[in-house]
Regions:
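Well-ordered beta-strand positions
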Residues: 23, 68, 91, 141-142
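ATP-binding Walker
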Residues: 11
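P-loop (Walker A) phosphate-binding loop of NTP-binding proteins
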Residues: 8
């Protein structure tokens, strides 16, 4: 079955996914290719609900490839339908990292414009983070604590699962 890399934005899903398989599936990148605009622009034009629908459709398609390494966006767990799909997948790997580390990573990543980060205060962002934690943990079949580990170390842990 597919290996799904779960975690909040900034957890390292894309970086680790590329190490595990250069042809891995980054759902955000695939959606951007499909819609022809950035996710931030899509949020403004179509709204978050429309984005979450596209995300669910993409997840359904990708889960058909049993050998895939898939990196969904951090909000994949918000949609109950996505959680149902993921609960049937035996390899959901949660890349766990604390809020302050994530916040610092995202704040320092000038190349990636993340709508939920840009449009919320730190306190509001923390509430989103706290709301998703139990969802990640409930769906995870494996939890990898990634703080103080290099992407290569994280990838090696995942290979051993």
């Amino acid at each position: 079955m597919a290996k799904i890399l779960l975690g909040f934005m900034g957890a390292g899903k894309t970086t680790v996914g590329r190490i595990l398989d250069p042809k891995f599936h980054d759902m955000d990148e695939l959606i951007v290719e499909e819609i022809g605009m950035s996710i931030n622009e899509y949020f403004v034009v179509e709204g978050e609900a429309a984005f979450r629908r596209r995300e669910a459709e993409m997840l359904e398609r990708l889960l058909e490839n049993e050998e895939a390494i898939i990196s969904p966006g951090g909000g994949i767990v918000v949609n109950p339908h996505n959680r149902d799909l993921l609960e049937n997948n035996p390899h959901n790997i949660y890349l766990r990292v604390d809020f302050e580390t994530l916040y610092s990573r995202i704040q320092n990543d000038k190349a990636m414009q993340r709508p939920l980060f840009l449009n919320n205060s730190k306190e509001e962002f923390k509430k989103i983070f706290d709301g998703r934690l139990p969802l990640y943990e409930a769906i995870a079949t494996h939890i990898v604590d990634v703080k103080d580990k290099t992407p290569d170390e994280i990838a090696e842990i995942i290979r051993c699962l």
